[in-house]
Amino acid sequence: MQLLNIYNTLAREKQPFVPIEPGKVRMYVCGMTVYDYCHVGHARVMVVFDMVHRWLRAAGYDVTFVQNITDIDDKIIRRAAENGETIGQLTTRFIQYMHEDADALGIVRPDHEPRATDYVPQMLDLIGKLEANGLAYQATDGDVNYSVRKFDGYGKLSGKSLEDLRAGERVTANDAKQDPLDFVLWKSAKESEPPESKWNSKWGMGRPGWHIECSAMSCTLLGEHFDIHGGGADLQFPHHENEIAQSEGASGKPFVNVWMHNGFVRVNDEKMSKSLGNFFTIREVLKEYDAEVVRFFILRAHYRSPLNYSDAHLDDARHALTRLYTALKDTQPGGYAVDWEEAHAKRFAEAMCDDFNTPIAVSVLFDLASEVNRTGSSVAARQLKGLAGTLGLLERDPHTFLQGGKKVDGPSPDEIEGLIAARKTAKAERNFAEADRIRADLLAAGIVLEDKPGGATEWRRA
């Protein structure tokens, strides 16, 4: 297989991927803050890094994949108080919902899914190292802050100097900070906050800042220097910049070799956000569309490109995925093993090894589907199913998918079968006008009938 090249945000270019330990990859991806339902932006992070995880394994790497859960922060404390429940009750419920969404989207569970509240001792240890290295200080308000001016490499991920960052970023004024860009490592507790949101430390009762959580969990589980760190583009600054400052400031070692960031999800060319009111949860979308359609919609775009969300784009993805499943419906492809020496597989691998170029990889799947339709080749069908499987696609029985589709009001499977039986009776009675009417009515309802040799009729949703 070809050498893998990945766009490294830190270097601002594609680079050959060379793991720290030959044959092994250690990867960390920033996960969810569990106080609300996951939205389509979260779905993109899930699917993109699941795709990366799957391809690394397909390429023969032994992957250790860590994705954290943020189960303590201001929003969580606030939401639990609003609901009149404990923080644990709130986060447990939304972790379950997150897992349900991820499972529906075909996400392979990470090897480790650390919760921030289980790693507070490691966070305190890391803050202590930063203080000992002269990079952290306790402010007059009780918070422990990171002193960005004392870390020479601050800004290297975003490519901005401290002066640029101070001028261009919205930084909340705080007289207790030595620099407006300084960020909280340990947040001093307030009397009004619940006991389960506070831990004891040498700096007093409090809780960890958001950024220190990821540094502590990633370094504990993957080591102080690991291969890949991923997340959404919105995390590049300040979150990932601050992770670098914390981790390298404590260890004196390079933190991560390759930084990967997926692009935003946009609605009508605006970033999806609650404030703009163009916000869709995964659950809302899955009421309307099959989960594999949503996964396919995400994978048709390059992971670094903006992804424009609309019903029209999802409908187009549904039709396209239907074409792929239709190519497999009359074949018995057997096993899923890929022949990587075959021409289509080589093109597919070349695309995936070029910074995970899924649009090109998906185009290879359509080329294979055309060959299956043209020749009925079981070899091509096996390749189609096997290659798609590396993307988490085409893993269901084709007929199951083809009789699903968009989840809208329409005839149920039993109603469709009843109408097919009525059409068969009409044809037997030579009432072809009635048979044609039934076919036309079903087509208007989005149901396509296909008459097979021997008198059988199959159906699928358009």
From Swiss-Prot:
InterPro entries given for it? Cys-tRNA-ligase, Cys-tRNA-synt_Ia_DALR, Cys-tRNA/MSH_ligase, CysS_C, Rossmann-like_a/b/a_fold, tRNA-synt_1_cat_dom, tRNAsynth_Ia_anticodon-bd
Top EC class, one word: ligase
Required co-factor(s) are: Zn(2+)
Cellular component per GO, a single term: cytosol
- Catalytic activity reported: tRNA(Cys) + L-cysteine + ATP = L-cysteinyl-tRNA(Cys) + AMP + diphosphate
Q: Which GO terms describe its biological process?
A: cysteinyl-tRNA aminoacylation
Q: Where is this motif: 'KMSKS' region?
A: 271-275
Please give the PANTHER family that the UniProt record associates with this protein: CYSTEINE--TRNA LIGASE, CYTOPLASMIC, CYSTEINYL-TRNA SYNTHETASE
Family affiliation: Belongs to the class-I aminoacyl-tRNA synthetase family.
Stated name of the protein:
Cysteine--tRNA ligase
Species per Swiss-Prot/TrEMBL record: Cupriavidus pinatubonensis (strain JMP 134 / LMG 1197)
Lineage summary: Bacteria, Pseudomonadati, Pseudomonadota, Betaproteobacteria, Burkholderiales
User: What gene is this protein a product of?
Assistant: cysS
